[in-house]
UniProtKB/Swiss-Prot annotation:
It comes from Roseobacter denitrificans (strain ATCC 33942 / OCh 114). InterPro entries: Aminotransferase_I/II_large, HisP_aminotrans, HistidinolP_aminotransfase, PyrdxlP-dep_Trfase, PyrdxlP-dep_Trfase_major, PyrdxlP-dep_Trfase_small. The keyword Amino-acid biosynthesis applies. CDD domains: AAT_like. One of its GO terms (molecular function) is histidinol-phosphate transaminase activity. Its cofactor is pyridoxal 5'-phosphate. Coiled coil: none annotated. The modification N6-(pyridoxal phosphate)lysine is found at K217. This is Histidinol-phosphate aminotransferase. It catalyses: L-histidinol phosphate + 2-oxoglutarate = 3-(imidazol-4-yl)-2-oxopropyl phosphate + L-glutamate. Belongs to the class-II pyridoxal-phosphate-dependent aminotransferase family. Histidinol-phosphate aminotransferase subfamily. Pathway: Amino-acid biosynthesis; L-histidine biosynthesis; L-histidine from 5-phospho-alpha-D-ribose 1-diphosphate: step 7/9. It holds the Pfam family Aminotran_1_2.
Length: 359
């Protein structure tokens, strides 16, 4: 006999992140991972450098300073906030703590690829609801709720489509999710969706709604891996019992606290993203490349078929530009393009114009 993994584990395909290198190119333009093209707040960088002088000290285990900062900025109860190693850790802990063999984890067909992995890792059964026009379909999700449903993961705005649904639609879903299930609103890109509170108001309205956020996108701290969740005190208490006591480093905590407090930097990044997103979408449309209105920091460019998408990707690589192939998300005919700075957007559109043979 040999030791074997739990059922479902070997059904998990390894996660493939956005490419970072092009053979023969020293510094490609990386638009494959939805990173902040402006980097992170200078205040965060300075705080990280300062904190690095005390690396022999253990970090805070309750993350109180960061939770207080998040609560103050967003008007939330800091006691109902938990911090994790990216929002990924918290999404994983939710599956670990609330789902298991015989349970179902529900998500949409083009949702974050890790949702299936979270379900299988917990021994639960993944259940997929179809989308409508690349957008979350509330009715399709409701139709697939069963007594076995324990978690419903919704990315809003969605990755890789950039589409989003409003609070009223989410409220209707929350009203339909039974009290024995958790509705998890994955808000990795929530800040880019103007007028959306990430679901905070729904968390306050319903006992079984959880929202998550990350510092990896808008705040430009992907290298530090910091995320947070907001839920009822009861759910937070459960998650705190299964997370590691020193899950976040002192450097990560300090950098995230400085970043969330630098509102001027945040507002500048949001304004720049909104402006360049409009430019990118408009430029793609002028080239005859379809794309849905995006509410995130990326645009899903849809080509005629998979062959054209792969050819476009190869052409962009030849010009030193990295974007994301999203066949694994069910879009073989599409490329996901991170919204960059003004000159980045110009470079992408010019390269695609040459690919299309447009002068």
């Amino acid at each position: 006999m040999r030791i074997t993994a739990q059922p479902g584990i070997m059904d998990i395909a390894l996660y493939q992140g956005g490419a970072s290198q092009i053979d023969g190119q020293a510094e490609p333009l990386k638009l494959s991972s939805n990173e902040n093209p402006s980097g992170c707040s200078p205040a965060a960088s300075a705080k990280v450098a300062e904190t690095a002088l005390d690396l022999h000290r253990y970090p805070s285990t309750d993350h109180s300073a960061l939770r207080m900062a998040i609560g103050q900025v967003h008007g939330l109860d800091a006691g109902r906030i938990i911090c994790g190693v990216g929002s990924d850790e918290l999404l994983t802990l939710l599956a670990m703590a609330f789902a298991g063999p015989g349970d179902e984890v529900l998500y949409t067909e083009h949702g974050f690829s890790m949702y299936r992995i979270f379900a299988l890792s917990a021994g639960a059964t993944p259940v997929v609801a179809p989308e409508k026009d690349r957008t979350v379909d509330i009715d399709a999700i409701i139709d697939r709720l069963t007594p076995a449903t324990r978690l419903v993961y919704i990315a809003n705005p969605a990755n890789p489509t950039g589409t989003a649904i409003g609070l009223e639609a989410l409220r209707r879903l929350a009203q339909s999710v039974p009290p024995t299930s958790l509705l998890v609103l994955d808000g990795a890109y929530a800040e880019f969706f103007e007028g959306y509170d990430g679901g905070a108001s729904l968390v306050d309205e319903f006992d079984n709604v959880v929202m998550t956020r990350t510092f990896s996108k808008l705040y430009g701290l992907g290298g530090l891996r910091v995320g947070w969740a907001y839920a009822t005190q009861e759910v937070i208490d459960v998650l705190n019992r299964v997370r590691g006591p020193f899950n976040l480093s002192s450097v990560a905590l300090a950098g995230a606290e400085a970043a969330v407090n630098d509102r001027a930097f945040v507002e500048t990044c949001l304004q720049e993203n909104a402006a360049q997103r409009v430019r990118l979408m408009g430029g793609l449309n002028q080239l005859g490349i379809a794309c849905d209105p995006s509410h995130a920091n990326f645009v899903l460019a849809r080509f005629a078929d998979e062959a054209e998408a792969l050819a476009a990707d190869a052409h962009l690589k030849s010009e030193g530009i990295l974007v994301r192939i999203v066949k694994g998300y069910g879009f073989p005919e599409a490329l996901r393009i991170t919204v960059g700075r003004a000159d980045d957007v110009t470079r992408v559109l010019d390269a695609l114009a040459r690919f299309k043979g447009v002068s």
